[in-house]
Amino acid sequence: VDLTNILEIYGGVVDYFDPFSLVNGIKQVEHVPTGYYHTDAIGDSAVAYIEQFSKNKSPFFLYVAHCAPHWPLHAPEEEIEKYENTYNLGWREIRRIRYQGLIDKGIIRTENAKMPDFMFPELDWESNPNAKWDSRAMAVHAAMVDRMDQSIGKLVDKLEATGELANTVIFFFSDNGASSERPSKYGPGFDRAGSTRDGREVVFPVQKDSMPGAQTVHSGIGPEWAHTINTPFRFWKAKSFEGGINSPFIVHWPSKITDKGIVKDNPAHVVDIMATCIDLANTTYPENYNGHVIKPTVGKSMLPILMGKSTEGTQEVYFWEHFGAAALRKKDWKLVRLEKDGPWELYDLANDRTEMNNVAESNPKIVQKLKKEWEDLAQIYEVYPAPN
């Protein structure tokens, strides 16, 4: 394995201005240049790799794993200023605007994707004592997304300049719904440094008394904004309701995809990406490596969907489990529980995309059947016994 073309960090949390675990190739980076911003570095490295790889005729694969917009909320001030007043309207009004935008763009339909009530009915923006802080937090979050978008634009421009764009497949997606996490609950430890590399203290503001955006402040957007970002769904990252597991997925392949600019609602799973790449390369998944047997991939190719040849999902059954939160989807039926000891709920996603009408009580046989399938798959995917 060639490790020279790698720029990465270790751990899930990054100081965007000076990552302490930054590795370039096989060497730790101990000093970053003035003005360093990690999102830019990822994008610039990707552009450099394309310049390098495009010089020969061999196919190339590039995995561009942006950290943004994962907390901590870090962004250059000039980027934050673009969104300085955007979120002063508050959670509820921003939700309403986003929901209407999704309808106007044809991404959702009102007949099967009604907007649930705000999950925090006791909270009112007008009486929010932290409105200035909360508005600033979302402005930083938006700035992080904006900067990532700029870096992806540079990557696309480089593909076009090298003549590679038309025959390059680009997958763009997020690993989960927006996160409700508040880093102030954690404090320093593990991948969360208590100080910058040059010795300045990093604060985790419990009382929201340090404004987000700067290198020395580690903060997140919290559950109210996570719920808003995940419009029209409920819940957020780490939960198996749609707000936690449903992610935008954009595919760009100019020379082959004829259905341009349309929205498809075929379900697929992240495990299907490897199978799709194998299909694109016209090869087969390996059975062994260095004398070790490799488990067969459970993914299925998305090519039939992308080429307009299938109206179905990639899998017969989709399975999720994360710290006890769990779900199973079979066609349009979805069985889901909020936490390990929580009750199973049942939703008909064809008519209730936003999981507002729990029909478990009126469909006990379907619940039992899907629950049995979930338990069987939990054994296969090694949910049991719980890993150390």
Predicted regions mapped to residue ranges:
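Flexible glycine/proline-enriched surface loops and loop-helix/loop-strand junctions
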Residues: 25-32, 80-85, 132-138, 213-216, ...
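Formylglycine-dependent
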Residues: 1-89, 93, 97, 119-143
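A long, amphipathic alpha-helix that forms part
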Residues: 43-51, 85-109, 130-168, 178, ...
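Short, solvent-exposed turn/loop segments enriched in Gly/Ser/Thr/Pro and often Arg
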Residues: 4, 62-72, 113-122, 171-180, ...
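Long, internal low-complexity/basic segments
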Residues: 114-120, 124-136, 273, 318, ...
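Loop/turn elements at helix/coil->beta-strand transitions in domains of secreted/extracellular proteins
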Residues: 55-62, 164-170, 313-315, 330-333
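C-terminal cap/loop subdomain of S1 sulfatases and analogous C-terminal strand-loop tails that border
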Residues: 2-3, 7-8, 214-245, 256-266, ...
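Short, solvent-exposed loop/turn and secondary-structure capping segments
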Residues: 6-19, 63-65, 72-80, 114, ...
